[in-house]
Amino acid sequence: MKTYNDINIGDTVYIWGTSDSSVDETTITEKHDDRGHWNLKFSNGCVGRALKNGTSSTMGMYACLVYSDKEAVRESINERIKILSNIKI
């Protein structure tokens, strides 16, 4: 899996967690070093922040994450399914 250290300006990243649970694409338009993090700007106008060796970042005011590649999206979805399947109602 890619980390945000591997991501460059112009690369495609994947947004998951929007209201309809779709996976959308955006690109990195700015990437600035901030100690152990990257401050990011995306082509959709939002800004975010990621750990340098992380596979996901936050995005603006949205309750969604931006993943470095599609494998990271799949891993996150599978982990959430595992957590939800263990909840007893």
Please annotate each region the language model reported:
Residues 18-19:
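Short, surface-exposed secondary-structure boundary micro-motifs
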Residues 35-37:
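Short, internal acidic amphipathic alpha-helical interface segments
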